[in-house]
């Protein structure tokens, strides 16, 4: 159970980190105004 709890906590932290990174990236893209820079 402890391992599952640690995996869950890591998953939440990674999710928040990726979300923050995505938000920062979208702000940078808006500042550059380059619509042809999205290949996700």
Curated annotation (Swiss-Prot):
Subcellular location: Secreted
Keyword flag DNA repair: no
Main location: secreted
Keyword vocabulary terms for this entry: Detoxification, Secreted, Signal
BP-aspect Gene Ontology terms: response to toxic substance
Signal peptide: 1-20
Record's GO cellular component terms: extracellular region
Record-linked InterPro entries: SMR-like
Coiled-coil ranges (or none): none
Domain of life: Eukaryota
Pfam families (alphabetical): PROL5-SMR
Purpose of the protein: May play a role in protection or detoxification.
Protein name: Submaxillary gland androgen-regulated protein 2, isoform epsilon
Encoding gene per record: Smr2
């Amino acid at each position: 159970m402890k391992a599952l709890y640690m995996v869950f906590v890591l998953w939440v932290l990674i999710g928040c980190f990726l979300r923050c990174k995505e938000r920062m990236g979208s702000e940078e893209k808006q500042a550059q105004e380059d619509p042809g820079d999205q290949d996700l």
